[in-house]
Structures are given as structure tokens and as C-alpha cells.
Amino acid sequence: MQGVYTIHIFDRFMILIKNTFIPLSEKTLNQFPRFYSRLVFTLVMISQVFITISCPVEAMQIPDLDTKGDVYKTEGANDSLIYDSTIGNKKCIMLYADFSDAVMKVDTKERANGVLGNGLFQKLFYEQSYGKMTLDVEHVHGWRRLSKPASKYSSRTTESHRELFVEIFDLYPKIDFLAYDYIMVNMPRIGNTAFGERDELAIPYKGKKINVALNISSVSPYVLAHETAHLMGLPDLYTYGGVEGPKNPAGPWDIMSSAGKASGFLGWHRHKFEWLDANRKKYISSGMHRLEITPLNASSGVSMIVIPVDDPVKPSKVFVIEISQPLRGKDSQNSVGVLVYSVDAKLATGRNPVVVYPKLDLLKAPFHAGDHFNHIDAPMGIKVLKKNKDESFLIEVKVD
């Protein structure tokens, strides 16, 4: 991306004129050589001004957000001690386990088609990543019985969740789970939960450690996508744990806040996963900008604008502008527009790290042509000038 220096041309020009001509006004006739030399100097300086104006400089890339500490499942850079790259082909293994007090009678092939949405799950990650990530899911069909009733297991604590996976792995002695990127276990009663820990808390397996795995009870490709994204480092965007302030402030605009309504991941998450190319995003920290912003699913154009709230070189919080993705179901009508939200890397999963700033309410959050956005929390103001035929929007952003 290219940027240009902004120079106060008029002020600089007037200073040059004043320094050249006013001192000469009384002695112009008898000091013509000196006058001539100053005139030439002035013209040279003016030309340098215009050369400087047109000289492009490399625009600043979006820096990693500063978490200001050790934050669990942050919107900042992924913890490399837990999470692997989110680029390339990923091998997944899907298992099926039940309990004596929760016996599963549905055929596991039918269950697989339901939870994967007949391929919708894999398609979602392929399309959202612009083809940069593919998921191959291998199945071990047939329900295998755990040794105790479901009531004796839990995924509510790290310890109980780890013990559950240790026993599940013991049910499959011939499988090398270290050969897989993501382990997915279908089971009733235990809920939908992702495990992700550093080695000291990870799942012990054959003298090594497995850092990520998930269990799923729901039959939904979007719920599975939500839990899989946890294995990739994303936090929950819905609120829990006694957090003060708004509940679920990200609304239905990302799978991590609403697997029931969202159709994909916010632009920030595509950026975090390194799916969104550098020329598709813009980082601005000052000035007035008139920009055309394209949908995230477009093949070109700037689709995400990021503005720092604090230190522009090492921010901990930013605001993001993008075009919203259409919601699923009955709420899809008029759900596409300019979406504004903040991302705070200091806040852990479930503690509102992403907040959408809606035009009306969270279901009607996007802004449309003629709308203005200003908020006391935001470092910028936005005018939505028009919507183009190609679904892009022309906006004006003024960064304070």
C-alpha cells in the first residue's frame, strides 16, 4: 500500500514569497542580481514542495496488538506455544463417543453429515480463508463407550476436560493422534467445548503433549466452526464470567459471538489468521481519507480499515471499519452495510474483546449511504457517502 505526505502548501509558499520579495522591496533596482538569485531559489523550493507531495511512501502495516500481559485467547497475535499456523491443509480426525446414561443410537455417518453440514463446514473455512486453508476430515465411525456415566465427566475445568480427552484417546489405541492438527469428538451431554493449553497443562499422550482438541454435542456446522476456531486461537465474543458492561456486544456479526446467525468471521479474524492479504487492508492513524471499501468476499480492493486508539506503533486497541457479511436466516434483509467495531487485545475470551458500535441496535448495526458515525470512544468519525453498484461503499474517515 502506498501513502503520501500531506504538506501545508499554501503556508510554505507564502513564507517563501515573504522571505524573498518583502526584504527586496526597497532596493530592488540596485540589487537586481540578488533579487534574481532569490527568485530562482524560491522557484526551486516550490518545485521541491510539489515533488514531495507526489512522492509516495510505504504505508504502515497493521502492527500486532499489545496485550499488556499474558492474556488467554486474545485478539492479539496467537500464542505459538499453543496454536499452529492457520495456513495450508489441516488434517482433522472425527471420533464418536457416548455413555451408559446417554446412549447414541443414530448412525455415525448420519451424525457426520449433520455436524459437517454435508461439506458446509469445510466450504466455510475454504471460502473465508480465500483458499488459504483447507480441512480434511477423517472419520472413525461407530460409537465407543466411555467407562463412566456422562454425569461423572465435565469440560468445565481444564483438569476435568484434560482427563476426559485422556480417556477418549485410550479408546483408540491404534490411532496416532499426534498425526492430526485438530481432534474432534462427537458426544452427548458434555456440550460444545474447545481445549487449548500450553504444554504444562496440555493433554499427555505417548510421552508428548496435545495442545488442542474439541468435543461437540450440537449437530451444526457453524457450532463446529466456532469450536474449531478456538483451536486456531480465537476467543469467545459472547459474554460470560460476571463481566460488567454490555452482554454479547459483538452481536450476530461473527461466528465467535453467534453461531446461530453469523455467516462467517469478521475482517479482524481473517487478518489474525493471515488470510486477508496486505493489499486488502489499510492502517491509518491520522488525517482525512476518502476511501472505497469492498466486501470481504471480494477478490480485490481494500476491505478492512484499522485505526489505533492508543499508540499507533504498538496499539493495544483498534477500531475496524468493514462491510458486514449478510446474516443468515430471517435477519439477512438489509444486514449489509458499513460495520464499525473495536478490538481490544487486553481483554480475554468472554470479556468483550470485540464491541460492535451499531447504527440502531446490534441486529441493525450497519451504516448506509448518508449515515454518519461518531462516538466518544472512537478516534475517528465516518461519513458513508454512497453505495456503489459493485456492493462497495465510498466513505470518508477523519482520524482525530
Sequence positions of predicted segments:
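Extracellular hydrolytic enzyme modules, especially secreted metalloproteases
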Residues: 177, 182-331
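Sequence-level motif detector for i,i+2 pairs with an aromatic at +2
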Residues: 87-92, 130, 138-141, 180, ...
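N-terminal secretory signal peptides that target proteins for export/translocation
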Residues: 1-34
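Residues at the C-termini of beta-strands that transition into short coil/loop
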Residues: 98, 259-260, 344
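Boundary at the C-terminal end of the N-terminal hydrophobic targeting segment
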Residues: 54-59
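Zn2+-dependent metallopeptidase catalytic core
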Residues: 61-219, 223-225, 310, 383
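Bacterial N-terminal signal peptides
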Residues: 40-52
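Non-catalytic C-terminal accessory/binding modules of secreted extracellular proteins
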Residues: 61-77, 105-106, 197-218, 288-400
